[in-house]
Amino acid sequence: MPLIPDSIQSIGVFHVDDPFNPMPDPGDADPETVAFAFFIGIAVVFSLLLITLVCTAAYLVCTSSYEGEYDEELANNGDGSRRGILNFRPLFGKKNSNGLLLDSNFTNPGEFDDNEEFIEREREALIKMSPFEVDSYMRAKEFQIVSPPAVQEFGTYLDSKDLQMIKDRGIQSYYFIPSINDNVDKSGHFLPSFLVQDKLEVEFTRWNKSSSAVLNYPLPYNKKDAVYFEVKVYNHKPNSNSIFSIGLVTVPYPYFRIPGMCKFSIAYESTGKLRINDPFFPSTLLPKLVEGDVVGFGYRFKTGTIFITHNGKKLMDVTQNVSVELFIALGAMNASYTRTYTKDGLLEDPDNIELRNALAEGRELKLSKDIQNPHNPMDETKWDIIDSDEIELHVNLGQTGFVFIEANVKKYGFGSVFGEIGIPPAYNPNDIQKDKLIQKGEELPPQYPEDTENFGLFGNLKIKSHIKNPLKEVSSNPSAPELIQKKLKTPIVKTPKVGIYEFTTPIDRKRETNMQPSINPPVYEINDTRQSSPEITNETISNEETVSSSSKAEPALQHGQSNKTPNKRQNKKTKQRKNKKKGKKNK
């Protein structure tokens, strides 16, 4: 048997031919060693995860404390700003790689540096502006000092009456406030900058210089993830001398400035600019708007994010951590009065710094006269006023379908179209023809019966009285006159017929003698004699004679006197007189 080298023995390898040293079974390895190695690997992984979590928590704690110090510093400013303004810091923007606008104060400069930077930027911008732009900027600045914007927490602007109105009427309660601009002609006639049609359709007129239309109510809480609205460019010429902007503002907002140019406002300009509290020269980040485009704005409640859509596609998230009351605003401005825009539209490269510097320094350039010498509507000597091209914008709050599909699926509209009151009645002629109740109007008034004696002109009416009428029992009997006479024990006077009717009247002797009003008024019955008329007999004539003679024999009552003689004594005297007369005749 050959000898096995020591190197081979050290690693436990044996020849197969050796019957005394067979190959060891690999399954015979120690299981405790394997389990120990497995647990060591798991411990290493969990330790790495724990270290990562600890580092993340430390970073978040440091960042939150840093932000708290920053908020406290801003809250202690001397400008009288409220705590709600702190939620609007992301509206001063620079764009990161993800398309989200971050705070321009991301490096947290001091208060003095911010003021100095703003003053320097304002000085450079005012030199490049036209007289109309400078005047509008100074007026807006003074306007917001006198009437500061109401930066309130979201959901605190409306009172109970407004909330009830929105609940009852739904989207029908929203409308744009009419124009209050101060445009007048030489005669003093009011020239509106824009007209509001059907509550949510705004048309900027040819008299518009620069104005904004603001919605009456802020963005509502619709109990969804977000609230969303869209604006369609219904009328806008390709080479228009007017520009418009669509956005969100706080109130009160300067009515002579378009959205995005004043504090606490954001707007999508038709030139492709995204204006966020920027009255100077913002960057062009969005596509230009033409006739037929649809622009959408959305606000997410949890994160306070505002996002923008264009023709149904989401472009970017603009801000975050916004929790103030915002109102929809539409604005338009005549570009003929500005130095940045031309009458034929926006310059090809509006962000060209060299071009702006050349305009500011007054160099001789081959530019149009509208750029070198913009029109000035405030010059009373020239009356240099250019008609503005009309612009029409339609707002959709959810009364119709959105172009943005997500808003339709998740129901991001402003709420119910007609509220809890419901839809008003329709006055369509086609619907009226199908209405069975309205079609029955041709058969009205109904045909009343001709028998007015039993039915009456106004129907078979019965009147209940609290006074008992002794004639009630005999009023329905055809032999009423005889029964009335027995009931009242008074004779009935029959007057001659007048036409085809005959009147019978009961006489109350007691009432005549005492001159006292009767509790129960006399009843007059009308007997229809068209079929048969009663005959006049000798008894009726004799009764009439006795009644007439007795009435003549009664003495006339004087004023303040009453006849105290009973009726029976008068009857006896009359009988005695008649008997005496008959006795004399017989003699």
UniProtKB/Swiss-Prot annotation:
Glycosylation sites: 105, 208, 321, 334, 527, 538
Region of interest (Disordered), residue spans: 509-587
Gene3D superfamilies named among the record's database cross-references: 2.60.120.920
Keyword annotations from UniProtKB, A to Z: Endosome, Glycoprotein, Membrane, Protein transport, Signal-anchor, Transmembrane, Transmembrane helix, Transport, Vacuole
Location in or out of the cell: Vacuole membrane; Endosome membrane
Highest taxon, organism lineage: Eukaryota
Membrane topology category: Single-pass type II membrane protein
Compositional bias of kind Low complexity: 535-551
Cytoplasmic side: 1-33
Stretches in topological domain Lumenal: 55-587
GO molecular function: ubiquitin-like ligase-substrate adaptor activity
Transmembrane feature ranges: 34-54
Biased segments, Basic residues type: 566-587
Classification via Pfam families: SPRY (PF00622)
Cellular component terms (Gene Ontology): endosome membrane; fungal-type vacuole; vacuolar membrane
B30.2/SPRY domain: residues covered: 162-349
UniProt record, GO biological process: protein transport to vacuole involved in ubiquitin-dependent protein catabolic process via the multivesicular body sorting pathway
Role noted for this protein: Components of the endosome-vacuole trafficking pathway that regulates nutrient transport. May be involved in processes which determine whether plasma membrane proteins are degraded or routed to the plasma membrane.
Membership in a protein family: Belongs to the SSH4 family.
Full protein name: Protein SSH4
